[in-house]
Curated annotation (Swiss-Prot):
Designated name of the protein: Large ribosomal subunit protein bL27
Source organism phylogeny: Bacteria, Pseudomonadati, Chlamydiota, Chlamydiia, Chlamydiales
GO cellular component: cytosolic large ribosomal subunit
Superkingdom in the source lineage: Bacteria
Native organism: Chlamydia trachomatis serovar L2 (strain ATCC VR-902B / DSM 19102 / 434/Bu)
Record gene name: rpmA
Gene3D superfamilies: 2.40.50.100
GO molecular function: structural constituent of ribosome
UniProt keywords, alphabetically: Ribonucleoprotein, Ribosomal protein
């Protein structure tokens, strides 16, 4: 057995801060224009009707309405306007 702790011990112990990614709004929920729907890295969810995509792939609402998600070959997020 080693009688010293080893040189790596004091250099370990770091962890990055979580980025709080994922869905921020569920299907069927009412949203207003500009609301963030999804925070993501890459395009796990794709924008559809009345949904925009930011430069960091964040999806946001372009109109007031109800969130709808549809899964085909990809998962699409839409906002259906409410009268």
């Amino acid at each position: 057995m080693a009688h010293k702790k080893g040189q790596g011990a004091s250099r370990n112990g770091r962890d990055s801060e979580s980025k709080r990614l994922g869905l921020k709004v569920g299907a069927g929920q009412r949203v207003s224009t500009g609301s963030i729907l999804v925070r993501q890295r890459g395009t796990k969810w794709h924008p559809a009707v009345n949904v925009g995509r930011g430069k960091d792939d964040t999806l946001f609402a372009l109109a007031d309405g109800i969130v709808v998600m549809k899964k085909t070959d990809r998962t699409y997020v839409s906002v259906i306007p409410q009268a």
